[in-house]
């Protein structure tokens, strides 16, 4: 397995709308494994293929962070949502930053598993929030897009500064 490079906001590639997966082959299975490896390495609970510059509708989730409840959603569709909730969300593409995003408390999602079999999932709590967050990525949306322009610009400035610091340390 390989750790993939996570795109950092405001990288324009994060705005790309992902295409549906049509082939379920060994390459897809390896990519899913690499997504999980990357997600765990970065200490995340969810990752969308868009975040690693692959613009296919693939999401990996494990809200335990302990490799015990791996969930793969391919070509996910939100069918229903109810209730209102929200938390200070973080994101691997916005390292070290958090922002409040209003979300549905419960969601129903239809997706394909890694073998291409369709299933329906009813989720609530953190799992529901994570699913909505990752589907946003597939639609070219990051949580910063929900924030005021002032907060969004501050985040961009912090991340540009962080990227410059990282570049200097790597040189």
Swiss-Prot record:
Free-text comment on the cofactor: Binds 1 Fe(2+) ion.
Pfam families for this protein: Pep_deformylase
GO biological process: co-translational protein modification; translation
Residues the record marks as active site: 134
GO terms of molecular function: metal ion binding; peptide deformylase activity
Disulfide bond annotation, renumbered to this chain: none
Membrane-spanning parts: none
Residues annotated to bind Fe cation: 91, 133, 137
InterPro entries in UniProt: Peptide_deformylase (IPR023635), Peptide_deformylase_sf (IPR036821)
CDD domains: Pep_deformylase
Cofactor dependence: Fe(2+)
Recorded catalytic activity of this chain's protein: N-terminal N-formyl-L-methionyl-[peptide] + H2O = N-terminal L-methionyl-[peptide] + formate
Keywords of this entry: Hydrolase, Iron, Metal-binding, Protein biosynthesis
EC number: 3.5.1.88
Function as written in the Swiss-Prot or TrEMBL entry: Removes the formyl group from the N-terminal Met of newly synthesized proteins. Requires at least a dipeptide for an efficient rate of reaction. N-terminal L-methionine is a prerequisite for activity but the enzyme has broad specificity at other positions.
Sequence similarity: Belongs to the polypeptide deformylase family.
Annotated protein name in UniProt: Peptide deformylase
Species per Swiss-Prot/TrEMBL record: Mannheimia succiniciproducens (strain KCTC 0769BP / MBEL55E)
Gene: def
């Amino acid at each position: 397995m390989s750790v993939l490079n996570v795109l950092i906001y405001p990288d324009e590639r994060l705005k790309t709308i992902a295409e549906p997966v049509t082939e379920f082959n060994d390459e897809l299975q390896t990519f899913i494994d690499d997504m999980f490896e990357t997600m765990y390495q970065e200490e995340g609970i969810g990752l969308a293929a868009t975040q690693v510059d692959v613009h296919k509708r693939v999401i990996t989730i494990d809200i335990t962070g302990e490799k015990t409840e791996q969930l793969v959603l391919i070509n996910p569709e939100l069918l229903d949502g109810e209730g209102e909730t929200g938390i200070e969300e973080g994101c691997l593409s916005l390292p070290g930053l958090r922002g409040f995003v209003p979300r549905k408390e419960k969601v129903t999602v239809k997706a394909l598993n890694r073998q291409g079999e369709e299933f329906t999932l009813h989720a609530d709590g953190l799992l529901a929030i994570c699913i909505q967050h990752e589907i946003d990525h597939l639609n070219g949306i990051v949580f910063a897009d929900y924030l005021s322009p002032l907060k969004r610009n501050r985040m961009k400035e912090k991340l540009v500064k962080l990227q410059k610091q990282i570049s200097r340390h790597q040189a």
